[in-house]
Each structure stands twice: as C-alpha cells, then as structure tokens.
Design a protein with these regions (language model features):
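PLP-dependent amino-acid enzyme catalytic core
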Residues: 1-157
Length: 157
C-alpha cells in the first residue's frame, strides 16, 4: 500500500508517511542504507542518503543548525533578518529555513556565481545582493559583514 493510501485509510505508521506542519522537522530524517553488492566480502558498507532532505542537500542540516543556534543565543527573533555570503547551496537551505521560521533572508553572491542558484533563493522568499565578480568571496563576505553591522542583521556563519 502506498504512503498516501495509508494516510487516507488512517493506518500510515512509518516515519516516511508522517505529515509535518513544519518542513524543517524533516531535515535529517534521512535513511542509512547498507550497500550489499559493492563492498568486498567481509566489509559492511553503509551510505547516508542526504538527498532525502527537503532540498536534497547536506546543507539543509547546516542551515537548521545555524538558525537554531541563533535562536538559542537570543540573536534571532520573529521578523529578524538573516544574511549570508554564499556560493549557493547553504544560502538556498537558509532561505527555506528562514521562510519557515518567519525570518527575512538576504544572500550576498558574487556576480560570477550561478544564475540558477541566484534564482532559487527569491523563489524561497529570499533576496539576493550581487557583488562585483572581481571581488570574489572576499567581496561577498565584506558586504555581508557590512550590512549585518549597519542594519543589525544576524550574520550566518
């Protein structure tokens, strides 16, 4: 029986059939699978399937850890703005987590970085600020630090 059919019949009892009100609660709920055919005899080989995270990325775990740490330290409250200098993956995950938690998210990216990644963050509710390509990562970090300091935003690290 499919997960959906089980939910409709009221007897879906496996973790993969749970219904969540908060996408961040699914982060890290990734299976470990024993690889039977690729490992040499006598070797137990396991893989952690991180692509089961909401955005199919290990960066989902990092993003929720950064946000929860900021919340525990009292640096993040409803309505806060989170800013990060990013090449994309962590920023995408932070945009998702911030959208769920009620924070504004701003990513600082160099103009040389992927246009596709720059498009995903606004789709998740984030804003993207572009820095000149020749400044690279250093320029991104400097801009993020400057904006965090000047505007009182939470700098994701």
């Amino acid at each position: 029986m499919s997960c959906f059919a089980g939910i409709l019949k009221g007897n879906a009892n496996t973790r993969r059939c749970e219904i969540y009100d908060d996408i961040t609660k699914t982060i890290g709920q990734t299976p470990i699978v024993k690889v039977n055919k690729l490992a040499p005899e006598g070797v137990n080989l396991y893989v952690k399937c991180e692509y089961f995270n909401p955005l199919s990325s290990v960066k989902d775990r990092l993003a929720i850890a950064i946000i929860e740490d900021g919340e525990k330290r009292g640096e993040l409250k409803l309505g806060s703005t989170v800013i990060e200098a990013t090449s994309g993956n962590t920023g995408i995950a932070l945009a998702m987590v911030c959208a769920q938690r009620g924070y504004k998210f701003v990513a600082v990216m160099a103009a040389s970085l992927s246009i596709e990644r720059r498009k995903v963050m606004p789709a998740l509710g984030g804003e993207v600020i572009i820095t000149p390509a020749p400044l690279g990562g250093t320029g991104m970090v400097q801009k993020a630090e400057e904006l965090a300091e000047r505007r009182g935003w939470f700098l994701a690290r």
